[in-house]
């Protein structure tokens, strides 16, 4: 006689439990395959997972390559690919059917930097349909890339991914001449080689599910920029159908968060490290003293109101003619300047963490 009431109660409890369930995000990275502090897939994924948890009840997992555990994809709301040629990873023959089933289920899909690419002809079309756009890395493909300082600009201020950030300077390895589906919507633009290109996009798949692609994140240190990381985390939130806060995602971090694990840190060029010379070596002392003076010069400019892009441009111009500096080695990252001495010692001048731009 009371069975309908009991049944209704069980249904309501199940509904409430479903509402309270954490949002599951699987981030797929891989071991290092590039030079020092670039393509730092796994450390980047760990940081993104950390920032997601600052924005609600998220359950995250970072996988080293395509997961083989039977329940790895169970209940996953979104998959983030930050690896070598994400399309080839996602639609690899060994699990292409599994990947397509995830897409058909309507999961969110996010690809970052090289993860946006595909080189295998068999994966290219399925990847394009899944992501809405991709870096065509096939032999003879038309997509290009260039390392260049640019400004990341809002393409659609009304889109949720655009919340909480404004145009910001960034040096990255930009992919351009990408292939897009007509329904893909640019959310971020950058000028590469003097021409505007979409570098971030959102795509609502006709069969259900959201996809977000962003070609930046070649350099690990770019994550020191708050608007840069907010753009990325906004995109992941949107892909999971989580409401993006009006002020954008929370993306708090500390300087130590940019430290790399040993697997990636060991890529530091040991042969060109001052540590290979005896302690107290007069040359090392002089070069380190010079580096400290250059850092002080950069700090002084910022303390006196010089904007970050101008301060970086000024210190870069100064280093190009500084004694003992290899001018071909001087590079800005948007959050600092790398340079090497004529002996091959590498140094980095960094924008103080508390002076990096915030986009509220």
What are these regions (language model features)?
Residues 1-4:
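Positively charged n-region of N-terminal signal peptides that target proteins for export
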Residues 33-38, 89, 195-198, 222-225:
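Short, solvent-exposed loop/turn elements at domain surfaces
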Residues 24-28, 33-118:
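Helical hinge/lid and interdomain linker segments adjacent to catalytic or ligand-binding clefts
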Residues 301-309:
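Charged, low-complexity interaction regions
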Residues 7-17:
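Bacterial N-terminal signal peptides
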Residues 133, 141-208:
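Catalytic beta-strand/loop cores that center a nucleophilic Ser/Cys/Thr
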Residues 21-23, 29, 47, 54, ...:
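Extracellular ligand-binding/catalytic regions of CAZymes and related secreted enzymes
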Residues 28, 86-163:
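A glycine-rich, often tryptophan-bearing local segment used as a flexible ligand/cofactor-contacting loop or short
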